[in-house]
């Protein structure tokens, strides 16, 4: 369980990405945004079919993905002041990890202490179940400007991949929340003709090796939203389990991305 490996600017499992600048006129499709409450009432929709909500962590951990379901949510209404924790931590750079010792040393009000207890408990139950949770403070992620026609940073819709069976767990406590999209409403970027043509220019090798090139460079992990796609905001305080692309997986991996942060706002989230 947990992340296998990441690039500094990627929030995905086991993803590695001097490619000359390629300038194209591709324009991103802006999906429609949905929240979790609207999904629960949209019976029969692709969003509702993708998500199952559970009532306990044990259910979240033990419930298998099946059919179209590749996102499980332990929906919670959290108490406490998480912004107090964020405001007490000096962030040197765009993001930093807050370890348990540093968290416990913070001098907090009653509301801040309530928030801290939730963070400590979430980290404990994840560790107890074999995960390696990381508590991150995020001002923003680094942008990938190496190849403008195909950015591979976390703001791009992508799936996680692992050589072993695993799931991705995450929860946002403060700031903008992560987003997912139903697989039926997204297309692999490597299948978009214009993008595929540009990738072939980058590859510049024998046709027989092109598909291996896409996999080895992890271009095949990234997706583009279809017209009128409905992006689902994961909300604050809810602990999520997302399906990962791994050998033996019985469902499609969950397509997700990091949100665009609001100026001056810092995200507080756990991921593993």
Please provide the spans of the model-predicted regions.
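Short, surface-exposed beta-edge/turn micro-motifs
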Residues: 68-71, 132, 166-169, 236-237, ...
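N-terminal auxiliary "cap/dimerization" subdomain that precedes the catalytic jelly-roll/cupin core
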Residues: 2, 7, 12-130
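Catalytic core of non-heme Fe(II) oxygenases with the double-stranded beta-helix
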Residues: 151-229, 235
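Catalytic core of Fe(II)/2-oxoglutarate
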Residues: 217-272
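A general structural signal for short secondary-structure junctions and capping/turn motifs
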Residues: 62-66, 125-127, 160-163, 170, ...
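Short helix/loop capping segments that flank catalytic or ligand/cofactor-binding pockets
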Residues: 83, 180-182, 250-251
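Short, structured patches in soluble enzyme cores that scaffold and shape functional sites
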Residues: 137-139, 171-174, 182, 244, ...
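Extracellular-facing segments of soluble proteins and assemblies that are Gly/Ser/Thr-biased and enriched
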Residues: 108-160
């Amino acid at each position: 369980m947990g992340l296998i490996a990441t690039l500094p600017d990627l929030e995905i499992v086991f993803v590695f990405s001097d490619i000359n600048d390629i300038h194209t006129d591709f324009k991103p499709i802006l999906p429609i945004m949905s929240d979790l409450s609207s999904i629960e009432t949209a019976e029969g929709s692709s969003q509702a079919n993708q998500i199952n909500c559970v009532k306990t962590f044990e259910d979240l951990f033990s419930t298998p993905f099946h059919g179209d379901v590749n996102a499980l949510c332990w929906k919670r209404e959290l108490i406490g002041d998480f912004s107090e924790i964020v405001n007490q931590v000096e962030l040197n750079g765009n993001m930093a990890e807050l370890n348990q010792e540093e968290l416990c040393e913070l001098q907090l009000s009653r509301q801040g202490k309530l928030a801290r207890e939730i963070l400590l408990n979430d980290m404990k139950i994840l560790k107890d179940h074999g995960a390696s949770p990381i508590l991150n403070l995020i001002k923003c992620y680094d942008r990938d400007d190496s190849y403008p026609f195909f950015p591979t940073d976390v703001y791009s819709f992508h799936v996680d991949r692992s050589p072993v069976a695993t799931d991705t767990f995450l929860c946002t406590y403060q700031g903008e929340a992560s987003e997912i999209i139903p697989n039926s409403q997204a297309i692999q970027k490597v299948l978009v003709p214009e993008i595929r043509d540009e990738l072939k220019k980058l590859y510049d090798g024998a046709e027989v090796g092109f598909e291996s090139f896409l996999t080895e460079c992890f271009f095949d992990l990234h997706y583009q939203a279809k017209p009128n796609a409905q992006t689902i905001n994961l909300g604050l305080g809810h602990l999520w389990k997302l399906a990962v692309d791994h050998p033996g997986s019985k469902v499609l991996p969950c397509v997700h991305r990091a949100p665009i942060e609001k100026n001056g706002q810092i995200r507080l989230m756990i991921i593993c």
